[in-house]
Regions:
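Terminal leader/tail segments of proteins
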Residues: 19-144
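Sec-dependent bacterial lipoprotein signal peptides
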Residues: 1-19
Length: 144
C-alpha cells in the first residue's frame, strides 16, 4: 500500500512540476527571437538570426561576429554619430521610461521621437553589411 501511495504521489509531483506557465514561456521566447538592436553603454549590437551579429563601437568601428570590418573615414564618422544619437536616446529612455521591460527584464523599448532616425536612410547602401538588418534596426532596445 505504501509503495502504491508513494508512486502515486511521485506521479502527481512530476505532473505538477512539468506544468509551467506555457503562455509566459512562449511570449518570452517570441520576444527573444525577434530581430533587434540593443543599445548598451559601450556597444550597439544588431541581432538577426541566422545572420551574424553586428557590433558598433563608440569610435565608429564595426565588428561582424567579433571580426573588425575595415571602413573608410566617412563610414566610421557616420557610425560614430549614430552611436552618440543612440546613447542619448538610451539615457532618455532609461531615466524617463515607464515602459514595460521585455520578458527577461534586461531591455526597454527605445523611444525614438517622430521625425528622428539614429541612422541615415541610405545606411545599407553606404555600408553593405547592414543590408539584411533593416528589421532589427526598426526594433531598438535600451539595455539596462
Amino acid at each position: 500500500m505504501n509503495k502504491l501511495l508513494l508512486s502515486l504521489l511521485l506521479a502527481c509531483i512530476a505532473t505538477v512540476a512539468g506544468c509551467g506557465d506555457r503562455e509566459q514561456y512562449t511570449a518570452h521566447r517570441a520576444e527573444r527571437s525577434k530581430p533587434k538592436m540593443e543599445v548598451g553603454a559601450n556597444m550597439v549590437s544588431v541581432r538577426r538570426a541566422p545572420y551574424p551579429n553586428l557590433d558598433i563601437l563608440p569610435d565608429g568601428r564595426l565588428r561582424v561576429d567579433d571580426i573588425e570590418i575595415p571602413l573608410d573615414d566617412g563610414q566610421r564618422e557616420m557610425l560614430r554619430t549614430s552611436f552618440v544619437k543612440l546613447q542619448i536616446l538610451r539615457q532618455n529612455t532609461l531615466t524617463e521610461s515607464s515602459a514595460p521591460a521585455d520578458a527577461s527584464g534586461r531591455t526597454l523599448p527605445l523611444d525614438v521621437p517622430a521625425g528622428q532616425t539614429p541612422f541615415p536612410p541610405d545606411l545599407a547602401e553606404r555600408i553593405p553589411e547592414f543590408k539584411q538588418y533593416s528589421e532589427a534596426l526598426a526594433n531598438p532596445r535600451a539595455l539596462r
